[in-house]
Each structure stands twice: as structure tokens, then as C-alpha cells.
């Protein structure tokens, strides 16, 4: 959720004046960096240099390696500064310490820090971030890489042994290591293919003219700018010509991929340029990890990285259903009506979500006693439980700062308990840091505090009572928002002003007047209906807002000698005005319980909240997998939660960009990811929402979410959207066993569930930047329509002529030529889906909820390759528990006319197998048996080369996979 652009203009002037006053006072006491004077304009803001200014490091000479020691485990050395300090953007350290560790056969860690350990060292703080990467096996007897270096000047490079590829190469580049500026540069191959460096709005392939900034930022969908999360890892894919395919007269290629991680939570720019990539960090040390990757598949490279930061959580089965949400439901009755509308429209819906509307005056862990009364909520929850549906409320990061002089605030437990337990972030002087968010002046939990889990657990338990549930948990997960954490003022603006609370919530939120590109206004009837429905949405108003009483001064900054926190001399390319790193965010000078400044761990606040929420929820509901959807993420967030792509717009471009966003987050180890379907900001329209609802059915996390005052966009609002949704959801719910299997695979070893085409077909360089199509697992290729007013879409179907693709709907082979686009018919209510030959897809007959679908018989869809073979797998468990008493894995193979199923594990599935469909079968069988029993019910189509076998329930009445079986044609 964001503050509207229109309303920002009402208070930004006052806030910028606060910046000027505060920073001006600070810089009068700090005007020297090294031996250079800093120019201070009259407004008090120091003149700083960014990536767009002339580079200051041209005179830096780098370092020389001395006292070098090599061992089986790695290399250590001291690095002595060459020449005079260059003072590029700070004070140069004269002596550094190098520690190269061969941590795994496929991973090397290059650590460079100042010799006196002055700089903050992220890897020394396992209390902040603990990952498998911190527990290496030191299996260095069969290293897959070589680490090489030159001593004077010091430079290093990492190569892959098997093919000699140079993976990271600083030769010819100078290392710069200053107190608030660290620079490391690697040479890049020509026209390199880079993916990752999340989170940003960009196409899949990053290109070589881009600056990626890492600084958590509350801004809705800014293209090529920093956003909510920080994942400073990239995967590079390379291609090599190795011959000619005589049949196709085409060059053939081999490929390789590798990964690079710069482990830091500090602010950073990463410059992608034509022949180099450069890191520019404003603090910390260098902790570089190079992954040797794979010469076979980028999936292996992704797995190396994900397994090092922590394998993703396995979410409950129900999370794969469809989720309905909007900001602006006036009361619980409206949500009840929405639920009934879904039923009437025969559209599946799994979960209903509440935005901040349900809260009392937008205060966390409260419930509006009138609009969301306990009795009404209990009726609502009872209906959900009886229909196997779910509820998820939002929880913002900021806690309302109760006014000690206002007795109506006396009962606000989250604040007073936080004060008593000393939970909140502090100012440098030790007072509580007070910002401003929806409820007024707010404090912010310190999620690194060892006592915060108990505090957060108690707050969540209190929320269950506020819902009238007497301690039972009525919600199935939580939605953590605004957790960069966002703040609507600069600095600790409310430190001396809590007595003005309750400052009423915002009064200036307004409708976002934007409509999708290519909007067709001819269909005014349904548009008017949707708009009218939106008018019933209510937003609380009041006579004053927190922004009208924001203090014109900010708390003085806490500074180390010659160390500037809020205005470092190098300005990373932060999206906020003047690259201000303290704007619209909790200031980097805020400190944790042990005095650590946010400046050094800035990008991991959302990660901390997700981790703490996971721990708290597991204490409340032991052995039940928590579901936490977080806006801000960091390396390893997927271990504990899911992610949505934030406050997008109802634009075709945002629908397109969401494909790359989902693919990249799967590479980052967060497979449960999706966008706000139909868009959050601005009015959607019938065509865009129809296309997006269809595409969303093939995203791991599938939720329609809408902004306050925008027209309604629930799928039943328009007839065509309702029909498109039903069709796409029928496919999704049919494929729930397949979805659960690929999500389990992601949790088990890091294999991405949603994939770019180049990941699945790595030896085709033409796929390197294909981002208008995507793969779901190994077997499904989705080709959505991403522009208005069209009935056709083009897509590529990868693989050589031995590869087969089948149309999902008519089961016929798609006629294609190697490396050429195919034009596909795509009427408004249709999304093109193709099945890859060689696949066995486990399915179940769909119902309106995931629970009901799980009770239905199984089906198998077998799509044969050119050799008449296929393989597949199925994974099932109880869909709920963390510690599992039983699981079931089934391996499917089809070869020489026999379909085999081999189950392992003790989880019992009582549902029978109903049907088997086989595609690409060139002739009809004369007879069919299942474990020797005759099967008489089957049909074969010569036109489609499709065999449909039905009536298997009686033979498999004890369970589809209770035993191994062979289906023989």
C-alpha cells in the first residue's frame, strides 16, 4: 500500500524543510572528508556525487597483497594501499585483510575487510541472518573452480575448471576501500546475459546500461529503480557455438551459467556497463561469493545459490487457491456479500483478505468494533470454516505510539508492551524512534531484539481475541506490509509530539485517475456498474491528519567521527528526491537494541519481520506451516514466507513486467510469488482484467487486489472476466497436484517453480531475453496476451524438431518450425497453454476450493515425446504440517506402451484414479490392462492421436497410488 502521489505534495515541502534544517545543523560540525572540504549549499544539504556525476576514483591506485599465505582451504593476505589515499568518496583504509575460503566444491568466498575490523561486518552477525552459507562443508578436495590472483596491484579472478570460463575477473580494475565507499569491479564478456539483482521493475534480461540500487524503498512500481526488496545476486548465462545442425542448417550451441552474490545489507549501487560490472557500496565490507554454476542447466546454478541462503518454505496446500482482496471494504458485510457474489458466479475462491479497513483507526492488532464487530466476524469465520475457506488480515510494521496523556490510549497493548519490553527501534540518544504511518505517530519494532518473538506472539494472540475468537486463531496467515519500513515523515518526527496523538488517519487519499493503455470506452455499461460498486467503499475521514502536524525539525543525527549516516558522500541512486536515503523510510540512523545502526542492516527489516512472524505463528499453532506474505524481502526471506510484487498499476506494462518479477523471485528462492492481478493503482478495465485473471491462474501466488476508490475489479464484475476466470481457474484447480509437486521440489532443493524459457532450454541463445512467455515447472508453457485490442498472440515453442508441444485444449500437436514464432488465436476469454511432450501431469477433478478438489478422483495426462515416452512425478502430504509423519512420492514413466506408477512413502491417498489421457499415440491399442485386469472403457481419436481411458475407479478403489501399477496398452 502506498500514500497517493497527490497527497504527498501536501506534506513533502514541510518534510524537505525538516531535512534541510536537521542536516544543515549536522554538517556544520562535519565538513571534512579525508583532506577534502565538502561544499555546503545554503539549504544545508551537502553537495554529494552520484553515479551521474564525474567519477572521483580515477586516481585510486588500488592495493598490493603482502604476507600471502596459501593453504588447501584458501588464501589469506594483507592488502596495503598503493600510493597516496585517493579520497574518492571518503577516507581510504591503508591496510586491508583478504580471506579467500574454498567453502564448497562449487562456491568460493572472497572476504576483504579493513585490518582493524572497524567496518560493520555482516557475516559476523549470525544473530541477524543465519543461513546454510554460514556452515560450509569445506569440501575442497574436488573444487570445480580455480581462484587466481596477482599481488601488485592486487587483482583476482575465478575460473571454472571444466571449461576454463572466467566467472569473475578484477584484472585491470582498481579496488577502492574507504569508510563509506567501497568499489569492486569485474570485467564482463561481450553482450552478457544477466538475471537477478532484485528487486526492480525491468525486463528479464538486465542488459548492459543499467544501474541497480539496493535500498529498501516504498514506491509503487518505479521502472529501473529500487523497490521494496534487496537480493544482490545475479545469474549469468553464456553461450558457445559448437557446430552446425545439418538437418536445420542452424548453428548449435552449448551453454553454461554461474552465480555471484555480494552479501551485504548496506546501501549499494551495481553498475552494469558494456564491458564491466561495478559494485559501489556505502558501508560494510566485501563478502563476495562466486558459484561455479553448471554447464548443463541454469536450474543447477539456481539450486546452488538457493541452497546456500536457505531453501524455501513449503506452504500449505490451500495457499495455491485463488485469493480475493481489496482496500476499501467498509465493513465485514461487504466482504460477506463479495463471498456470496463469487458463489453466485460459480468462481472458485479460497481466501478473503482484509486491508487496513478492519483495524480500529488503522492501529495494528485491533479490530473496528462497529464495522467489523465480533459477532459479525464470528459469523463470517464460521461460514469460512464450514466451506473450507480462509482469511488473512494485513499487519503493518508500524505500531501506533499511544498518547500517555490520553486515557483512550491506555489499553493499546502493542505500544505499552513494546515500551516495557524495550522492543522498539531507538534514536541515537536512546529515545524511541517515532515516525508516522497510517494511524499517526508510530514506533517500529526492532525485529533483531531477542525478546521480539514473544512480544509479536502476544500481539497476534491479542488480535485473535479482538476478532472475538477467544484465543483460537481465526486467520490462516498474515500479510505484512509497509515493512521496509515505510514512514511518511523524515526522521524521528514524532519524538516530542506523541501527546498530539491520536492524530487521525489520512484524509487526503484520493482516487487514482488512470486507466489501462488502449482502454475501450465503448463498453460503458459494465464500466459504469464497476464504478458504481466502488462508490460504496468507505475511507475514514477526520479534521486533521498526522501530516498536518509533522514537526519542522528532526532528531539530530548520531554520527561516528567522519562518518555521515543520512547523507553519505557517495549518493546511491535511491529513487527518492535528491537520492535522499532518509526520505519515506525509517532513518538509517535509527538503532537496534545493541546499538547497530540501520544504516548497516538497512535492507533486511522486512526479512526480520517475516522471520519473527514465522517463529511467533509456529508457537501459536505448533507444527502448522505459517503463511506470511511480505512486501519487503531480503536474501533468505523465502525460508519463512512468500512475496507479492507490491503496489502495481492497472496497466498492460505492469502485467508484462510481472512475468519477469515472478521468474526472478523464483531464482531468488521465493517461489511463492505473484502480482496484484488486474492491478492495484488506477482503474482496471474489462479487457486487461480478463487477460490478467487468466495469466494469474498460472502464477504461484494468485490474488486480485485493488486500491481504495478504484472501480471494483472482482472477476464477477464483468461477464467476460468472469468467464475467463472460470476457464483459467478450471485449469489451475485441475493441476493442483502438479502445482503442489513443483512447489515441493522448490522447497526440497531450490528448483524454481516458475521459469524463463532459457532456464528450461539452455542451449538456445535466442531465448536469452524471452520474457513474454514462461514455463510452469518442466511441462507447461504459457503464452499470455499482453496488449489490448488483439485476438492473436505470437509465441515461440522451444526445442529442435524432436521436441513436441501439445495444445492444452484440443490436445493436438502444435505445428511449428524451429526457432520461429507461431501465431496463436487468443480470443478475450482464452489463454494459450501448451504441454511439453515427454510429460506426465498428475491432476484431480476441480472444485470451488482446494479442499474439495483434494477429495476428488485423480486423472493423469500423458503427453508423449517423439520416442513415445514420458515421465512425471507427484508429491503429496497432509498439506498442513511442518514436521510430517508421512509423505507420498509417485514416479510415473511411459515407455513401450506401458504406463507405470511407483509410489514411495506412507502417506495414504484414498481417492481413486479415474481417467488417463495419452497424447501423441500413433495407433489405437487393441486391449488395455491395469495390473492384469482388463480395462474396457477407452476411446481413441485418429484425428488427434489421443487415447482416453476411463472407468478406472473400481480397479483403484483402495487409492490411486496405494500400490505400484502398470497400465499396459
Curated annotation (Swiss-Prot):
Substitution effect: residue 287 to N: No loss of activity
Active site: 481 (nucleophile), 484, 647 (proton donor)
Glycosylation sites per record: 37, 67, 99, 116, 139, 146, 209, 245, 249, 331, 406, 429, 462, 470, 520, 523, 589, 648, 801, 810, 821, 885, 915, 934, 942, 954, 966
Superkingdom in the source lineage: Eukaryota
Effect upon mutating residue 877 to N: Almost total loss of activity
Catalytic activity of the protein: Hydrolysis of terminal, non-reducing (1->4)-linked alpha-D-glucose residues with release of alpha-D-glucose
Impact noted for substituting residue 484 to D: No loss of activity
Function of the molecule: Hydrolyzes malto-oligosaccharides, but has a low activity toward soluble starch.
Family as reported in the entry's similarity comment: Belongs to the glycosyl hydrolase 31 family.
Protein name per UniProt: Alpha-glucosidase
Amino acid at each position: 500500500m502506498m500514500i497517493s502521489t497527490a497527497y504527498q505534495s501536501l506534506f513533502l515541502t514541510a518534510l524537505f524543510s525538516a531535512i534541510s534544517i536537521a542536516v544543515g545543523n549536522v554538517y556544520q560540525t562535519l565538513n571534512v572528508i579525508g583532506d577534502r572540504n565538502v561544499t555546503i549549499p545554503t539549504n544545508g544539504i551537502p553537495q554529494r556525487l552520484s553515479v551521474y556525476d564525474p567519477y572521483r576514483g580515477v586516481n585510486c591506485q588500488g592495493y598490493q597483497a603482502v604476507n600471502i599465505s596459501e593453504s588447501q582451504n584458501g588464501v589469506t593476505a594483507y592488502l596495503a594501499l598503493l600510493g597516496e589515499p585517493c579520497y574518492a568518496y571518503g577516507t581510504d583504509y591503508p591496510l586491508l585483510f583478504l580471506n579467500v575460503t574454498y567453502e564448497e566444491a562449487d562456491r568460493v568466498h572472497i572476504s576483504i575487510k579493513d585490518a582493524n575490523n572497524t567496518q560493520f561486518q555482516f557475516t559476523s552477525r549470525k544473530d541477524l541472518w543465519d543461513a546454510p552459507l554460514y556452515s560450509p562443508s569445506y569440501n575442497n578436495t574436488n573444487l570445480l573452480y580455480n581462484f587466481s590472483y596477482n599481488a601488485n596491484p592486487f587483482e583476482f579472478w575465478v575460473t571454472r575448471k571444466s571449461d576454463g570460463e572466467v566467472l569473475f575477473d578484477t584484472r585491470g580494475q582498481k579496488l577502492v576501500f574507504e569508510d563509506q565507499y567501497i568499489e569492486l569491479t569485474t570485467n564482463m564478456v561481450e553482450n552478457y546475459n544477466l538475471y537477478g539483482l532484485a528487486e526492480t521493475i525491468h525486463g528479464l534480461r538486465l542488459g548492459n546500461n543499467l544501474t541497480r540500487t539496493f535500498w529498501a524503498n516504498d514506491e509503487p512500481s518505479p521502472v529501473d529503480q529500487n523497490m521494496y526488496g534487496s537480493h544482490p545476486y545475479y545469474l549469468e548465462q553464456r553461450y558457445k557455438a559448437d557446430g552446425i545442425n545439418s538437418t536445420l542448417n542452424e548453428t548449435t550451441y552449448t551453454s553454461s551459467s554461474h552465480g555471484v552474490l555480494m552479501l551485504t545489507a548496506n546501501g549499494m549501487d551495481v553498475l552494469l556497463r558494456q564491458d564491466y560490472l561495478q559494485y559501489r557500496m556505502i558501508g560494510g565490507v566485501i563478502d563476495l561469493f562466486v558459484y561455479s554454476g553448471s554447464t548443463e542447466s541454469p536450474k543447477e546454478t539456481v539450486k546452488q545459490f538457493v541452497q546456500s541462503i536457505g531453501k524455501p518454505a513449503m506452504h500449505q496446500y490451500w495457499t495455491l487457491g485463488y485469493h480475493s482482496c481489496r482496500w476499501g471494504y467498509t465493513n465485514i458485510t461487504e466482504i460477506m456479500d463479495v463471498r456470496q457474489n463469487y458463489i453466485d458466479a460459480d468462481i472458485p475462491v479460497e481466501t478473503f483478505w482484509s486491508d487496513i479497513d478492519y483495524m480500529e483507526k488503522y492501529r495494528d492488532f485491533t479490530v473496528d468494533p462497529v464495522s467489523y464487530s465480533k459477532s459479525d466476524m464470528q459469523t463470517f469465520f464460521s461460514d469460512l470454516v464450514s466451506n473450507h475457506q480462509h482469511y488473512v488480515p494485513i499487519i503493518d510494521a508500524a505500531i501506533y505510539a499511544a498518547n500517555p496523556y490520553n486515557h483512550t490510549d491506555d489499553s493499546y497493548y502493542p505500544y505499552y508492551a513494546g515500551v516495557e519490553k524495550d522492543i522498539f527501534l531507538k534514536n541515537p540518544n536512546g529515545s524511541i524512534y517515532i515516525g508516522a504511518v497510517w494511524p499517526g505517530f508510530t514506533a517500529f519494532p526492532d525485529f533483531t531484539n531477542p525478546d521480539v518473538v514473544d512480544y509479536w506472539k502476544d500481539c497476534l494472540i491479542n488480535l485473535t481475541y479482538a476478532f472475538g475468537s477467544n484465543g483460537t486463531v481465526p486467520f490462516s496467515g498474515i500479510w505484512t506490509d509497509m515493512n521496509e519500513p515505510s514512514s511518511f515523515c523524515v526522521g524521528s518526527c514524532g519524538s516530542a509530539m506523541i501527546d498530539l496523538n491520536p492524530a487521525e488517519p489520512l484524509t487526503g487519499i484520493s482516487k487514482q485517475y488512470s486507466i489501462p493503455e488502449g482502454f475501450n470506452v465503448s463498453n460503458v455499461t459494465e464500466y459504469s456498474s464497476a464504478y458504481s460498486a466502488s462508490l460504496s467503499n468507505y475511507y475514514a475521514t477526520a479534521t486533521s491528519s498526522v501530516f498536518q502536524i509533522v514537526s519542522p525539525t528532526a532528531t539530530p543525527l548520531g554520527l561516528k567521527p567522519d562518518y555521515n549516516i543520512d547523507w553519505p558522500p557517495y549518493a546511491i541512486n535511491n529513487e527518492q528526491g535528491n537520492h535522499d536515503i532518509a526520505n519515506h523510510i525509517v532513518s538509517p540512523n535509527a538503532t537496534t537494541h545493541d546499538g547497530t545502526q540501520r544504516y548497516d542492516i538497512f535492507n533486511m527489516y522486512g526479512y526480520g519481520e517475516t522471520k519473527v512472524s514465522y517463529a511467533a505463528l509456529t508457537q501459536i499453532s505448533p507444527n502448522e506451516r505459517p503463511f506470511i506474505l511480505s512486501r519487503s524481502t531480503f536474501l533468505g526471506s523465502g525460508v519463512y514466507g512468500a512475496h507479492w510484487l507490491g503496489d502495481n498499476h492497472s496497466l498492460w506494462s505492469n502485467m508484462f513486467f510481472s512475468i519477469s518479477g515472478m521468474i526472478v523471485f523464483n531464482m531468488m528462492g521465493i517461489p511463492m510469488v505473484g502480482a496484484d492481478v488486474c492491478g492495484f493503482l488506477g482503474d482496471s478495465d474489462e479487457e486487461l482484467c480478463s487477460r490478467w485473471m487468466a495469466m494469474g491462474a498460472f502464477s504461484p501466488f494468485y490474488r486480485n487486489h485493488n486500491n481504495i476508490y478504484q472501480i471494483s475489479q472482482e472477476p464477477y464484475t464483468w461477464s467476460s472476466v468472469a468467464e475467463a476466470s472460470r476457464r483459467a481457474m478450471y485449469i489451475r484447480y485441475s493441476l493442483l497436484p502438479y502445482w503442489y509437486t513443483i512447489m515441493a521440489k522448490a522447497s526440497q532443493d531450490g528448483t524454481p517453480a516458475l521459469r524463463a524459457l532459457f532456464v528450461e532450454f539452455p542451449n538456445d541463445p535466442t531465448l536469452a531475453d524471452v520474457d513474454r512467455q514462461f514455463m510452469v515447472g518442466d511441462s507447461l508453457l504459457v503464452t499470455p496476451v499482453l496488449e489490448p485490442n488483439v485476438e492473436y498472440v505470437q509465441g515461440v515453442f522451444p526445442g529442435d524438431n524432436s521436441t513436441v508441444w501439445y495444445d492444452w485444449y484440443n490436445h493436438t500437436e502444435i505445428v511449428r518450425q524451429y526457432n520461429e514464432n507461431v501465431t496463436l488465436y487468443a480470443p478475450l476469454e482464452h489463454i494459450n497453454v501448451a504441454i511439453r511432450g515427454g510429460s506426465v501431469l498428475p491432476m484431480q477433478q476441480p472444485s470451488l476450493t482446494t479442499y474439495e478438489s483434494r477429495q476428488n478422483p485423480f486423472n493423469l495426462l500423458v503427453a508423449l515425446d517423439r520416442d513415445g515416452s514420458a515421465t512425471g512425478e507427484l508429491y503429496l502430504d497432509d498439506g498442513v504440517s511442518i514436521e510430517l509423519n508421512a509423505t507420498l512420492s509417485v514416479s510415473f514413466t511411459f515407455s513401450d506402451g506401458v504406463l507405470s506408477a511407483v509410489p514411495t512413502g506412507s502417506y495414504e491417498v484414498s481417492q481413486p484414479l479415474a481417467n488417463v489421457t495419452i497424447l501423441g499415440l500413433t495407433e489405437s491399442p487393441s486391449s488395455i490392462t491395469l495390473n492384469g485386469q482388463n480395462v474396457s472403457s477407452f476411446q481413441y481419436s485418429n484425428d488427434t492421436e489421443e487415447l482416453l481411458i476411463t472407468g478406472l475407479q473400481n480397479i483403484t478403489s483402495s487409492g490411486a497410488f496405494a500400490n505400484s501399477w502398470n497400465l499396459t496398452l
